Amino acid sequence: LMKKFGRFEIIGETRDDAAGEAFDKAAKMLNLGYPGGPAIAKIAAKFKPTSYNLQATIYKLPRPMINSGDYDFSFSGLKTALLYQLQKMASKEIKEKTPALCAEFQQAAADGLVSKTIKAAQKFNAKTVLISGGVAANELLRQTLAEKLKKEAPKISFLSPAPKFCTDNAAMIGLAAFQKSRRKSAFKSWRALRAQANLRL
């Protein structure tokens, strides 16, 4: 939750795998390569459900913690459910049904992210929902969040950067450091700075 630029409060986070990590691991299970998000989205786009091939009734994956009552996420269970599903299938079937599996995995991940995000935005009277990071490049997530916000919370605006900016990069870290340096209480001298790989915002 950002009340003003550079001031954050964490109200929800993953309890295990990050969303992007779950996509990467799922793609590895399906032999789709890395990074997993774009690979799964590309194959999922090939799935066209029909009355004889209903996605929801063939490979229904769980939506972990979607009704947990808090704003945390979990993707480990979703990843494990996909693994168990693959273990029940022959190699030929996996190859034939990969688009359906990708579509369901992608939808399950998006459902969890969208549901928790909207609930949090409503609870804390957010004016705007902004998505960022690698998973924010996922078109299904962007579209689903935009549509559900418009339907369930029409007064909350939605912002999403162009997909090419939805990556980890030095520029965003540099900007964060620059803004922090402008606050005199942040640090006294750059010489006293120490690298911390797990530094929180």
Locations of regions flagged by a protein language model:
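Acidic, glycine-enriched active-site microenvironments
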Residues: L1-L201
